[in-house]
Amino acid sequence: MVKEYKTITQIAGPLIFVEKTEPVGYNEIVNIKMTDGTVRRGQVLDSSSDIVVVQVFEGTGGLDKDCGVIFTGETLKLPASIDLLGRILSGSGDPRDGGPRIVPDQLLDINGAAMNPYARLPPKDFIQTGISTIDGTNTLVRGQKLPIFSASGLPHNEIALQIARQASVPGSESAFAVVFAAMGITNEEAQYFMSDFEKTGALERAVVFLNLADDPAVERIVTPRMALTAAEYLAYEHGMHVLVILTDITNYAEALRQMGAARNEVPGRRGYPGYMYTDLATLYERAGIVKGAKGSVTQIPILSMPGDDITHPIPDLSGYITEGQIVVARELHRKGIYPPINVLPSLSRLMNSGIGPGKTREDHKAVSDQMYAGYAEGRDLRGLVAIVGKEALSERDTKFLEFADLFEDKFVRQGRNENRTIEDTLEIGWQILTHLPENQLGRIDNKYIQKYHPAHRKAK
């Protein structure tokens, strides 16, 4: 028998506090019956005492203490079906594209199940994004979680859409899909995302979840879990390689802070909840490859660093959980370079597992290391030139200074719709390395110089 409680004791922000007489489950879905007969949905946040804390998805405006509360005994579920592909949904899974509701094959708990560490396989297959600074120097590997650290005013949304359009697993027979979840975005950004997916045809292999800035903060906490549940369904039920792009994790963390404040929790660093690390881990750790499963889940969470501060708790904690970072730099953006990715502080910890013979090319690691070394030295020399002038540099130093400019102009810079293969990326790398004297290519084995260096290929 379903019981309806009329025991709301307090309404605070997006939360209601309900007195209970029977056990209630954590994350349980709640139906709130308004006095005018309409029904709102909520979710149990805390059931440890006689007072249950419920977050209301549609907000508490118009609620009063006479409203009825029904505990359903169910958690929030995603209606999962292969028909999810090609759809644009709200942050809580309702259609936003004017289409019909999804007819589910399964109803899946959005909180997911913990992945058995013993069943995890180490990531080892290359994912081609078509962006040289990622593919060439900070390679994304299937099953990896590799965040993009950006900042306000930088083109991380454009980079996210470019990756969503272009990403593929070369040589794989399994289908590839993208799950794109945007949190706390403006109506203008939502229109931009929707039109880009539809215009470029990328929507055919994508599932898009959009949570707007004026949607309840509660929905923002649900959105990435909806997206990851959809990704797991496509990966493990349909054998697809799924790339999940989550933007912007900073808006998600702000919603966590807002909910924590409404519950009068003791704040942690900079006002964020003390459990934020654990909460972020419940999202990031859902990436991976499971033994015996054909599909896989790869994650690119995107976060904007408040005040360009990489030590801020959100990027700081994300860095501990994930396997590297791609750093978007304001300095390169000011120069008009797109994508403005600074490879020096960027890192892909699993890169070596996904490159080399049979995956990309035998010279990939050597070319990447040499470009890193040359660019780092060229950047250092820019600081020296600012003090002593270019005339004081030796011929060798001048070559490295020019190499840094070439690297930014030819390798980093590319068009918003330019999809480079890994062969294109390595070829551009070799072309700019010809600017350095051959005796300075100390990080590249001589056999690769003989085989791939443009000067030697012409001689043959």
Curated annotation (Swiss-Prot):
Its main location: membrane. Pfam families: ATP-synt_ab, ATP-synt_ab_N, ATP-synt_VA_C. It comes from the Archaea. PROSITE patterns: ATPASE_ALPHA_BETA. GO terms for molecular function: ATP binding; proton-transporting ATP synthase activity, rotational mechanism. One of its GO terms (biological process) is proton motive force-driven plasma membrane ATP synthesis. It is found in: Cell membrane. InterPro entries: ATP-synt_VA_C (IPR055190), ATPase_a/bsu_AS (IPR020003), ATPase_A1-cplx_bsu (IPR005724), ATPase_F1/V1/A1_a/bsu_N (IPR004100), ATPase_F1/V1/A1_a/bsu_nucl-bd (IPR000194), P-loop_NTPase (IPR027417), V-ATPase_su_B/beta (IPR022879). Keywords: ATP synthesis, Cell membrane, Hydrogen ion transport, Ion transport, Membrane, Transport. GO terms for cellular component: plasma membrane; proton-transporting two-sector ATPase complex, catalytic domain. It is a peripheral membrane protein. NCBIfam families: ATP_syn_B_arch, PRK04196.1. Component of the A-type ATP synthase that produces ATP from ADP in the presence of a proton gradient across the membrane. The B chain is a regulatory subunit. Has multiple subunits with at least A(3), B(3), C, D, E, F, H, I and proteolipid K(x). Belongs to the ATPase alpha/beta chains family. HAMAP family: ATP_synth_B_arch. This is A-type ATP synthase subunit B. It comes from Methanosarcina acetivorans (strain ATCC 35395 / DSM 2834 / JCM 12185 / C2A).
